[in-house]
Amino acid sequence: MNVKNQIILALDVEEKNKAYEILDQTTEYLDTIKIGYPITLALGPSIITSIKEEYDVKIIADFKVADIDATNEKIVKTTLNYGADAIIVHGFTGEDSVLACKNMAEKLDKEIFLLTEMSHPGADKFLKPVSLDIAQMGVDLGIKNYVAPATKIDRLKKIREVVGKDSFIISPGVGFQGGNAKDTLQYSNAAIVGRSIYNASNPKKALEEIIESIKV
């Protein structure tokens, strides 16, 4: 997956008007949007289709799929059929659950991103001890796309070492959570930014400043 300007917008708002206002200001510089539960639960999964049709962007559904294999397969199928280009899945559920997601996505000519470790402090207790194992499982299963934290550069570096230089990593946590876009992109292919853009008084300017900071 190619990502324009190496920035993915995490559109974690709940109102359609606000979402469209932000997209109106930012899609000149962005071509990839991450949509999660806040907007999907508020407006229904058809919002994926609407945004896809209105703005012609790539959409990553951040649903952190984490169930048994049969249920995962249904979640992935339904989500991708609404128009998402990819879906994020948890790795801690194990090989069978992850493989169900991968196989369904491939059947629909779409992609999955395997979540190795999360960006918030609480992830250190349970996910951190197994994140490299999750990454290695992904490699063994032939997965090419991963999620790894921008807030923990040392962990991001280690995950990159496991998955290899040809894998595609996207990293949440840039901005409000403390991650730095330029530092993140030493090891990641794209930085995910949410509140620093959608909560800004001028989202377009905020995005421009982030893009400029990468180039410096």
UniProtKB/Swiss-Prot annotation:
Provide a Gene Ontology MF annotation, just one. orotidine-5'-phosphate decarboxylase activity
Q: Which SUPFAM superfamilies match?
A: Ribulose-phoshate binding barrel (SSF51366)
**Signal peptide positions on this chain:** none
Keyword flag Lyase: yes
- What GO terms in the biological process aspect are recorded for it? 'de novo' pyrimidine nucleobase biosynthetic process; 'de novo' UMP biosynthetic process
Free-text function comment from the UniProt entry: Catalyzes the decarboxylation of orotidine 5'-monophosphate (OMP) to uridine 5'-monophosphate (UMP).
Q: What's this protein's name?
A: Orotidine 5'-phosphate decarboxylase
Organism, as annotated = Methanosphaera stadtmanae (strain ATCC 43021 / DSM 3091 / JCM 11832 / MCB-3)
